[in-house]
Amino acid sequence: MELILNKEYRLVIIVLISVYYRYRFFLLLF
């Protein structure tokens, strides 16, 4: 159960980082 939670947490972090970098890139373009 702990492993599954850790995997989900890691996935959420990856998604957040991806969105953050995409948003930063968008801001740099304009």
From Swiss-Prot:
Its main location: plastid. GO terms for cellular component: chloroplast membrane. It is a single-pass membrane protein. Keywords: Chloroplast, Membrane, Plastid, Transmembrane, Transmembrane helix. It is found in: Plastid, Chloroplast membrane. The chain crosses the membrane at residues 9-26. This is Uncharacterized 3.8 kDa protein in ycf12-psaM intergenic region. It comes from Marchantia polymorpha. The lineage of its organism: Eukaryota, Viridiplantae, Streptophyta, Embryophyta, Marchantiophyta.
